[in-house]
C-alpha cells in the first residue's frame, strides 16, 4: 500500500485488534522490543499492525527495562523470538542528552559526552552483532530532536551533532550489508514527520514515552512492515 495513501490506526483501533486476538488460542509469534524509553503505545501500534498481517498467529511483544537499551538487547537472548526490534534514541547513548537529565548541562561537558557516546556505540555494535546470530533484527536510529547544546544559532551545524551523526553512520556502515539486520532509513522518516511533530515532552516527563500518537502509529507500521517483509538477500 502506498504510504501516502495508507490509513494509520488510532490507539483505540490498535487496542481493539489486540484484544480481539487475546480471545483466540493460536500459535504465538513472539517479538522482543529493545529500547531505553517506556514503549507503551508504540508496542500496541506495532503489535496491532503486525497482527493484521499474520492473522493465523498471535503476536506477543515483550520489552525490557527502562533506560537500559544495551542491557535489553542482551536480555533478548535469554528466550527465543521470531524478531528483535531495536530502537536507539540519543539518551540511550548518554542520559544527559535527554529531557529528564538535561538540567545540569554545561558546554564544558561536550568532550565527555562525545566520549561516552562513542563507548556506548561500540558496545551497541557488539550487542547487535551477537544478537543477530540468532534472530533477525530491525534497527531504528534516533528519531527525536536533541536540544541546542551550543552558543551558535540553531540553524548552524553544531560540532556535537556532527560527531553524533558520524557515530550512527558507523553503525549503519557496519550492518548495511548484513542479511540479518534491517535498518529504518532516517530520511524516510524525515519525509513524513518533522522532528518536533514526533516529540511529546509532556508524555515523556509523565510516562517516559516520548512520542506523539500519530508518529507512534506511523513508526509502529514501519516496524511491522520490516518483520512481515523479509530482508532481500544481499547481492541479488
Model-identified regions with their sequence ranges:
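Extracellular glycan-modifying ectodomains
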Residues: 1-236
Amino acid at each position: 500500500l502506498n504510504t501516502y495513501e495508507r490509513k494509520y490506526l488510532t490507539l483505540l483501533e490498535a487496542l481493539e485488534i489486540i484484544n480481539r486476538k487475546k480471545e483466540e488460542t493460536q500459535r504465538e509469534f513472539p517479538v522482543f522490543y529493545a529500547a531505553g524509553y517506556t514503549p507503551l503505545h508504540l508496542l500496541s501500534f506495532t503489535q496491532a499492525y503486525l497482527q493484521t498481517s499474520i492473522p493465523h498467529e498471535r503476536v506477543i511483544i515483550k520489552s525490557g527495562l527502562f533506560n537500559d537499551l544495551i542491557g535489553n538487547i542482551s536480555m533478548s537472548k535469554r528466550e527465543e523470538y521470531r524478531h528483535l526490534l531495536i530502537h536507539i534514541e540519543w539518551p540511550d547513548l548518554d542520559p544527559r542528552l535527554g529531557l529528564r537529565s538535561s538540567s545540569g548541562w554545561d558546554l564544558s561537558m561536550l568532550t565527555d559526552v562525545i566520549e561516552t557516546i562513542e563507548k556506548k556505540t561500540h558496545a551497541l555494535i557488539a550487542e547487535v552483532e551477537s544478537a543477530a546470530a540468532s534472530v533477525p533484527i530491525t534497527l531504528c536510529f534516533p528519531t527525536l530532536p536533541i536540544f541546542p547544546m551550543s552558543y551558535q544559532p540553531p540553524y548552524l551545524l553544531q560540532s556535537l551533532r556532527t560527531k553524533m551523526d558520524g557515530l550512527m553512520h558507523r553503525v549503519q556502515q557496519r550492518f548495511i550489508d548484513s542479511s540479518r539486520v534491517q535498518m529504518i532509513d532516517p530520511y524516510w522518516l524525515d519525509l513524513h514527520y518533522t522532528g518536533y511533530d514526533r516529540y511529546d515532552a509532556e508524555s515523556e516527563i509523565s510516562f517516559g514515552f516520548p512520542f506523539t500518537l500519530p508518529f507512534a502509529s506511523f513508526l509502529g507500521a514501519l516496524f511491522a512492515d520490516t518483520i512481515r517483509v523479509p530482508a532481500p538477500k544481499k547481492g541479488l
